[in-house]
A protein has these predicted regions:
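Outer membrane beta-barrel
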Residues: 36-65, 75-205, 222-223, 227, ...
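Surface-exposed loop/turn segments flanking beta-strands in extracellular/periplasmic regions
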Residues: 64-77, 310-317
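Low-complexity, intrinsically disordered short segments enriched for Gly/Pro and polybasic residues
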Residues: 1-8, 199, 208-209, 243
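Outer-membrane beta-barrel and related beta-rich outer-membrane complex signature
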Residues: 57-61, 162-164, 207-209, 257-259, ...
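Active-site-proximal beta-alpha loop/turn segments in soluble metabolic enzymes
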Residues: 167-168, 203-217, 255-263
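Detector for outer-membrane/organellar transmembrane beta-barrel domains
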Residues: 228, 240-327
């Protein structure tokens, strides 16, 4: 009779696994050390600790416990004519504290490689406030006049060279489109001009529908959002001035549902065309910024918009047609 000692076998397996793990770890460390020496890769760690203390005279329409303020809540009178929303509110928060890692010094395919990883404690949704949230995570390949960036970055309609300077963290929302999403971005430079093409999806900032805010509607359309922009930037260091201007357009299609309420396959989609034009002039003592936005179904960028059912083509099967809300 042969008896298997399972405890002994498990101990031997653990020892073997530990040895293999140590060897792999040592190999990875050696490989990374060699790569750093070869390419002189540098990691720059940064971030900050931020505390916000605020008091509002009335209730607000906002996110993250009042931290991301949109606008004051409307008047809501009770039977006695007293405004329910005329109730003060305050909060103390540290959720904007941020950590960041910038990577430089690598080279591949004759390109300079850089990257950025940034996170805060804002949370993706109101229920998970105070939890770690990914903000930016991308790799950039630079060939001089051509750049390729892939990863999570600012949405195309948020121009980092020209956005509102505000006291509140909302940065101009819901008028100014705001958000970050996964994307593939190609930039071609022509002197002071830049031609930019972007394919983007949705993550934390997503379209809204019957299932709430989710990137599923865009993914089910089978195609990412496409953006094309032209930027111009001129900097005069001697005079201390900077001039930036540009235009852009994007188009996306979402599929609000793949099955009707009566169980039939749904193929209806809704498209949306967006446009932006911007200008900034900065001098030593003043800065002027002008921006114009046109949007169709832009609820995914924290702006006023969305879509609606414009027609019921088959009441029995539940087929409908959609139209975007224009902003």
């Amino acid at each position: 009779m042969y008896v298997i000692n399972y405890n002994q076998k498990i101990k031997e397996m653990k020892r073997n696994l530990l040895v293999v793990t140590c060897l792999i770890f040592a190999f990875v460390i050696q490989a990374q050390t060699t790569e750093v020496k070869k390419n002189d890769i540098k990691l720059n760690f940064s971030g900050y600790l931020k505390n916000d203390y605020f008091w509002d005279t009335r209730q607000t329409v906002s996110a993250r416990e009042g931290h991301f303020l949109l606008f004051p809540a409307p008047v809501d009178n009770d039977p006695d004519g007293k405004d329910i929303n005329a109730t003060p509110n305050f909060n103390f928060l540290s959720i904007q504290s941020r950590v960041r890692v910038d990577i430089t010094g690598a080279r591949a395919l004759n390109a300079d490689i850089s990257g950025k990883l940034e996170a805060d404690f804002f949370g993706q949704l109101n229920p998970n406030i105070n939890l770690l949230r990914l903000r930016l995570a991308y790799i950039n390949m630079n060939w001089g006049k051509t750049e390729l960036r892939f990863g999570q970055d600012w949405i195309p309609m948020f121009i980092t060279d020209c956005f509102p300077g505000t006291v509140s963290f909302n940065t101009g929302a819901p008028i100014q489109p705001f958000g970050r999403n996964p994307q593939i971005k190609v930039t071609q430079k022509f002197g002071k001009f830049k031609l930019i093409g972007i394919l983007s999806s949705q993550r934390d900032y997503a379209s809204r529908g019957d299932a709430g805010a989710t990137g599923t509607y865009l993914r089910n359309s089978g195609a990412p959002e496409f953006t094309l922009q032209l930027h111009y930037k001129s900097v005069n260091k001697d005079a201390g001035t900077e001039f930036v201007t540009g235009i852009g357009a994007s188009y996306k299609t979402i599929k609000p549902q793949i099955e009707t309420g009566t169980g039939y396959k749904a193929d209806a989609t809704v498209g949306g065309m967006n446009g932006i034009a911007f200008l900034k002039y900065q001098a030593n003592k003043f800065t002027v910024k002008i921006e114009g936005i046109y949007g169709e179904n832009i609820a995914d960028v924290l702006s006023i918009g969305g879509f609606l059912v414009s027609d019921s083509t088959n009441m029995i099967k539940g087929f409908v047609e959609y139209s975007p809300i224009k902003t």
